[in-house]
Curated annotation (Swiss-Prot):
PANTHER family: ENHANCER OF TRANSLATION TERMINATION 1. The lineage of its organism: Eukaryota, Fungi, Dikarya, Ascomycota, Saccharomycotina. It comes from the Eukaryota. Residues 235-252 have a biased composition (Acidic residues). This is Enhancer of translation termination 1. The gene is ETT1.
């Protein structure tokens, strides 16, 4: 890595000074933060052209994305650099700034909202500024795919931080200026235009980028928040003393009123299905690239595998209760499923999950091996006790767990002990 200063940095600072500035940032005023950002020194990849300011800006943006994303000073640095480039461009009548400039600028403005989540007025201001910037970029670069990605990200973050975060169980849809499901539909429509534009250009490189994949993760996070909204044990201290009780509590949630802003999303499978359909399409688009990232492909396959496992949980539970639990003797159906129906559905879903988990396997990451073994064990549990199908799955899972346990010095001994008689 080569350390270079950007236009926003007038002189290089020693590492110790940089750390002190970052430490002081947390208590600095906005003006002080702006001043401090002018002292920022960042390590950028060696391939970044030191004479190309847009290339440097992209490197700074990438540095933030690859970090813990918890440094407001760095975000302010990106914004100050964008401001400087914009002023220079206006005063010197240079060539128009490229679309990627507007995308980075807009994302940085929206990112500031994450450091001020308790100040709703500020959050709104940041998103207004971010969306104005992305629209300004789209006026100059209609249908630019990077700007469409940026717009989708910003809209999803806005839904989470500006619209969902302030809600309580007593919230009413009448209190909002827009319905959240309509906002979500609008954001996803922009993402669909990303897919359509890539297809039109026959260029799928936009999907070989974790920043684009972040969109699907952001949607998944929103759906998770909605799904768990109102859980009775939210805010537990996390003690292990009553784990079994806590697990039961986690399943109990408060029913949302039909007038609640999240009611429509929580009581619909529409968005979960959208997530899966477009994650499949994401994988298809990745596979169209000759040199697509293997790491990204594994990540997408892992997410798909986990989604099928999650979907299998209800029928799996129904099958095991009706098959083995004495409390359910004489009961023919649970959750609208018979024992045989639940067994068949579970087997199909876990088989699909296994297919994707195998594609997600990383020889350098034993955790991915164990995910495969655990899915095999779950699938084995759905067959008759001591059947050939069950024995074959258990044996294969045992081999995988032993290998993972050996290379990790016993990390997965508990999983092995649970499997072995």
């Amino acid at each position: 890595m080569a350390k270079r200063t950007l236009g926003l940095a007038k002189a290089a600072k020693a590492k110790k000074q940089k750390k002190e500035q970052e430490h002081q940032e947390s208590s600095a005023s906005p003006d002080e933060e702006s001043s401090s950002s002018n002292q920022l020194t960042i390590e950028l990849p060696e391939e970044i052209d030191a004479n190309d300011e847009i290339s440097q800006l992209k490197g700074l943006h990438k540095t933030y994305l690859q970090s813990e994303r918890d440094n407001e000073l760095l975000v302010n640095g990106i914004i100050h650099e964008c401001d400087r480039l914009l002023r220079e461009n206006d005063s010197e009548n240079k060539q128009p700034l490229p679309a990627v400039f507007h995308a980075i600028y807009a994302i940085a403005l929206a990112e500031l909202s994450k450091f001020h989540t308790e100040e709703l007025d500020k959050v709104k201001e940041f998103f207004i500024a971010a969306l104005e910037r992305v629209e300004s970029g789209l006026e100059k670069n209609p249908n630019d795919i990077n700007l469409l990605v940026a717009k989708t990200k910003i809209l999803l973050d806005q839904i989470s931080l500006q619209y969902i975060a302030p809600l309580t169980l007593e919230s009413d849809v009448k209190e909002l200026d827009k319905e959240i499901d309509e906002l979500l539909d609008a954001a996803l429509s922009v993402y669909e235009s990303v897919e359509a534009r890539a297809k039109e250009l026959k260029d799928y490189s936009i999907f070989d980028d974790s920043e684009t994949l972040d969109i699907l993760e952001a949607l998944d996070d929103i759906l998770d928040i909605v799904d768990n909204f109102g859980k009775e044990n939210q805010g537990d201290d996390g003690s292990d003393e009553d784990d079994e009780e806590d697990d039961d509590e986690e399943e109990k949630s408060v029913e949302l009123a039909e007038t609640h802003p999240l009611y429509k999303i929580k009581n619909s499978d529409k968005y979960d299905q959208w997530w899966r359909d477009h994650t499949h399409l994401y994988l298809d688009n990745l596979e169209k690239l000759e040199n697509g990232s293997p790491e990204l492909k594994r990540e997408v396959c892992h997410r798909l595998g986990q989604s099928y496992l999650q979907e299998s949980e209800v029928p799996y539970s129904v099958f095991t209760k009706l098959k083995y639990d004495d409390e359910y003797d004489g009961i023919e159906e649970l959750e609208g499923l018979t024992e045989k129906e639940a067994q068949k559905i579970s087997q199909e879903l876990i088989t699909k999950a296994l297919d994707y988990l195998k594609q997600a396997k990383d020889e350098e990451d034993p955790e991915t091996w164990v995910s495969i073994a655990e899915a095999m064990i779950s699938l084995g549990n759905l067959y008759e006790v001591d059947s050939k199908e069950q024995e074959d799955l258990y044996l294969e899972a045992e081999k995988i767990l032993k290998r993972a346990n050996n290379v990790t010095n016993g990390k997965f001994q508990e999983e092995l002990d649970n499997l072995l008689p």
